[in-house]
Swiss-Prot record:
Organism: Ureaplasma parvum serovar 3 (strain ATCC 700970)
Domain of life: Bacteria
SUPFAM superfamilies reported for this sequence: FKBP-like (SSF54534), GreA transcript cleavage protein, N-terminal domain (SSF46557)
Protein name: Transcription elongation factor GreA
A molecular function GO annotation: RNA polymerase binding
Family named by the database record: Belongs to the GreA/GreB family.
InterPro entries, sorted: GreA/GreB_C_sf (IPR036953), TF_GreA/GreB_CS (IPR018151), Tscrpt_elong_fac_GreA (IPR006359), Tscrpt_elong_fac_GreA/B (IPR028624), Tscrpt_elong_fac_GreA/B_C (IPR001437), Tscrpt_elong_fac_GreA/B_fam (IPR023459), Tscrpt_elong_fac_GreA/B_N (IPR022691), Tscrpt_elong_fac_GreA/B_N_sf (IPR036805)
Record function comment: Necessary for efficient RNA polymerase transcription elongation past template-encoded arresting sites. The arresting sites in DNA have the property of trapping a certain fraction of elongating RNA polymerases that pass through, resulting in locked ternary complexes. Cleavage of the nascent transcript by cleavage factors such as GreA or GreB allows the resumption of elongation from the new 3'terminus. GreA releases sequences of 2 to 3 nucleotides.
């Protein structure tokens, strides 16, 4: 089973980022390291230390992206219906704690953006809503305190 659920758009962004790391950034940092080595003593060479730190950060990001690209499932490949909430669903909910209605979209963890109301299915709210139907009240369990929401409408 895939560890990451992502949209096609996010997948393409990650593929482009990996290409840039491999084709542009990695060769540039390799050149910086080579130039720093040519300066002589590496024990007090700030350019060398900075380049090594940047190389380590680039390697970490490259490894993260490769892990995602080896273990993903496209959201578009997940079957959706307007009968029950699933990843990719846009739903209207009533939040009793905030005393307001909200429209949110459930997305994979790699696509979440709370400021755009894109909520990860891995969050307490996302977990509480998945596989629920219109009209259902659910309790969202958070570390601070649980709260209730009601599914008003499954838009798509």
């Amino acid at each position: 089973m895939a560890k990451y659920t992502i949209s096609k758009h996010r997948l393409e962004e990650l593929q482009l980022e990996l290409r840039e790391i491999l084709d542009v950034k990695w060769p540039a940092i390799t050149k910086q390291l080579q130039d720093a080595r040519e300066q002589g003593d590496l024990s007090e060479n700030a350019d060398y230390d900075a380049a090594k730190n940047e190389q380590a950060a680039l390697k970490k990001r490259k490894d993260e992206i490769e892990e995602i690209l080896e273990n993903y499932e496209l959201i578009e490949d997940v079957l959706r219906s307007t009968d029950e909430v699933s990843i990719g669903s846009t739903i209207e909910i009533y939040n009793y704690q905030k005393d307001c209605e909200e429209v949110i979209t459930l997305v994979g963890s790699m696509d979440s953006d709370p400021f755009a109301n894109k909520i990860s299915i891995d969050t307490p709210l996302g977990k509480a809503l998945v596989k629920q139907k219109k009209g259902t009240e659910v309790t969202v369990h958070t570390l601070a305190s649980p709260y209730k929401v009601k599914i008003i409408k499954i838009i798509d």
